[in-house]
Amino acid sequence: LQYLTQEEPKITVKPLKTKYPQGAERQVIYVTTGRKIYSKMLPADAGCVVDNVQTVLAVYDAVCKCTPSMTRVMTLTGDAMAQPQNYKVRFGMSHAELLEEAGGLVEEGAEKIISGGPMMGFGIFDLNVPTTKTSSALLCLTHDDVADSQPSACINCGRCVEVCPGRVVPKLL
């Protein structure tokens, strides 16, 4: 993208480190501009607009090609996925059909399938549920991935709740 946009004075591509969480709007603004967006602020208050690549593509298709948004790219990943990768998916396709077209699950199958990411996603218990424009990923986990957690150094102080940029409460996961 840097190469493709090098002649565009109003576009800057800034590659980011693979780090979680870094995809949420407030984190993207902070890491790219250094501007903090406080709880009662909107990105526009900091002079920023953050658009998802999928949204930008849908707007382009609608405005320039006069075509409705009927597909999106979904990431199918996790140790239970036979062929983890990104797939172009038509809205309404069931998760079962999607998994089948994507090569299915590994032999031992999936213990848990999450729609979305590991922190903010939700469990899928019926694979006949259709994909929608908000479907972004399927995380397919093996038994080992979701096995009971081992004792850890956590002392249940709650500090993680105070500092989590995604406002996640780990004890509720």
Label every model-predicted segment.
Residues 84-88, 150, 162-163:
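Short, surface-exposed loop/turn motifs that are enriched in glycine and acidic residues
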Residues 2-95, 101-106, 117:
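Hydrophobic alpha-helical positions that pack around
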Residues 28-32, 104-161:
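Active-site gating/interface segments in enzymes
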Residues 78-79, 154-155, 170:
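Short acidic (Asp/Glu) and glycine-rich catalytic loops that position anionic groups and cofactors
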Residues 96-97, 162:
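Short alpha-helical basic/polar micro-motif
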